[in-house]
Amino acid sequence: MMEGTYYKEWSAVLDREMEFKVYGHGGVPVLALPARGGRFYDWENNGMPDAAARLLHEGKIQLFCADSIDGESLLAGNESPRRRAEMQEKYFVYLTSELAARIAELNAPERKEKPLIWCVGVDTGAYQAVQCRLRRPRTFAGAMGLSGLYDMGRFLGSAEAVSYTHLRAHETLSDL
């Protein structure tokens, strides 16, 4: 089994600790996002680092397995659609600002310019991965969405409500 380095660090955006695990020592940084309700360790439990062991050992890629907050956003059925969308947007800001900066530090601390990150996700993680690439193309070089769920209406309500709420959440969080 491929060994990784575990991190548990504070997120100012989410106002809580977030966990992630890193495999490899350099190369193209790849941010891996879990499936619906999943955790950072799901990638390891399902054999992803072992499947990519050669690329990781040769320093061609470095894998960063992030945690999700689906239980507080998409899957938080007891919360209003607005609150779930706001949490979803906070998670996006965490991924694209805080975690992306940390990935750059860990991936190539000696480089002056930040490396472009690839993002991969499964299920709702696929949606997150594609969002990272489409909304932050200067940070993310590409995205792979595996078995993606892209209709957030099933979690957040009607398309109009989701769009409006998402845009309002984005306006609120743009100052972070």
Predicted regions and their residues:
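Alpha/beta-hydrolase active-site loop
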Residues: 85-105
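Single conserved hydrophobic/aromatic residue that forms the stacking wall/gate
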Residues: 166-176
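Alpha/beta-hydrolase active-site loop signature
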Residues: 37, 70, 150
